[in-house]
Amino acid sequence: MSLNIRVIAPDGLIWDTTAEGVVLPSLTGQLGILTGHAPLITSLEIGILRIKTNSKWTPIIVLGGFAVIKDDEVLVLISGVEEVIKEDYSKAKSILAKAKIDLDSAKTTKEIIDASQELKIASAKVKAFKFI
């Protein structure tokens, strides 16, 4: 048996496939979904959504959203998506270093929130390279 997975962003369909499993970046931690999972609705934070097809994990950086799981169907509605390109690992590491500096130097509440979001995205990108 397999899961039917659809990932949709505001600008359109990102992913539509059958898969062996999926790991969602929920607000309470990583949430693994396999066939036969109980019905569930969960919020997603910025992080790595992983889809397992043909015994291989594919990472997708999601920028928050939510997921609905029912009857081996996984519908993921996300606020946005970031691409993970294999050749960009060193660039991702330098962006992560800059994001840490920006957060340390942030003074206003808005600067802190913006820098925190950028740090989460940069950190997810660097971690995603483990799966490609």
Curated annotation (Swiss-Prot):
A Pfam match: ATP-synt_DE_N
GO cellular component, one term: proton-transporting ATP synthase complex
Entries under InterPro entries matching the protein: ATP_synth_F1_dsu/esu, ATP_synth_F1_dsu/esu_N, ATPsynth_dsu/esu_N
Record key words, sorted: ATP synthesis, CF(1), Chloroplast, Hydrogen ion transport, Ion transport, Membrane, Plastid, Thylakoid, Transport
Membrane association type: Peripheral membrane protein
One example GO MF annotation: ATP binding
SUPFAM superfamilies: Epsilon subunit of F1F0-ATP synthase N-terminal domain
Keyword Ion transport among UniProt keywords: yes
Compartments it resides in: Plastid, Chloroplast thylakoid membrane
NCBIfam families documented for this protein: ATP_synt_epsi
PANTHER family listed in its UniProt record: ATP SYNTHASE DELTA/EPSILON CHAIN, ATP SYNTHASE EPSILON CHAIN, CHLOROPLASTIC
Family per record: Belongs to the ATPase epsilon chain family.
Complex formation: F-type ATPases have 2 components, CF(1) - the catalytic core - and CF(0) - the membrane proton channel. CF(1) has five subunits: alpha(3), beta(3), gamma(1), delta(1), epsilon(1). CF(0) has three main subunits: a, b and c.
Protein task: Produces ATP from ADP in the presence of a proton gradient across the membrane.
Protein name: ATP synthase epsilon chain, chloroplastic
